[in-house]
Amino acid sequence: MSNIPAELKYASSHEWIRKEEDGSYTVGISEHAQELLGDMVFVELPEVGDTLSAGEDCAVAESVKAASDIYAPLSGEVLAVNEALEDSPELVNSDAFGDGWFFRVMPSDVAEIDNLLDAEGYQAVIDEE
């Protein structure tokens, strides 16, 4: 069974968010998602300064098995991207909730967080797959 940290929020499309001290949110894909995709070979990230809409495809995770769109769990401006993934996409596999993060976003509507799932709700989504 996949690790699902309780302190994070999740989208049913397998992205997670973690609130940072400055009010921004770090975004990545869940351990379950990286397990389904397999070994990462390339990650395409949004650009710093991009404005995202919740649910918009904004990144791509490409593995030996497939390429998968990554969706913005929140609307807002991209503040940072994980440049380490450019040379080391396998960080998504080895540390999905840590060094394998994708980007940070400053939300334009924090109420959107209420649309995301807690760990228990996300586990239910996985169980239904």
From Swiss-Prot:
Its cofactor is (R)-lipoate. GO terms for cellular component: cytosol; glycine cleavage complex. Keywords: Lipoyl. It comes from the Bacteria. Pfam families: GCV_H. The modification N6-lipoyllysine is found at residue 65. Binds 1 lipoyl cofactor covalently. Residues 24-106 form the Lipoyl-binding domain. GO terms for biological process: glycine decarboxylation via glycine cleavage system. The glycine cleavage system catalyzes the degradation of glycine. The H protein shuttles the methylamine group of glycine from the P protein to the T protein. The glycine cleavage system is composed of four proteins: P, T, L and H. Belongs to the GcvH family. This is Glycine cleavage system H protein.
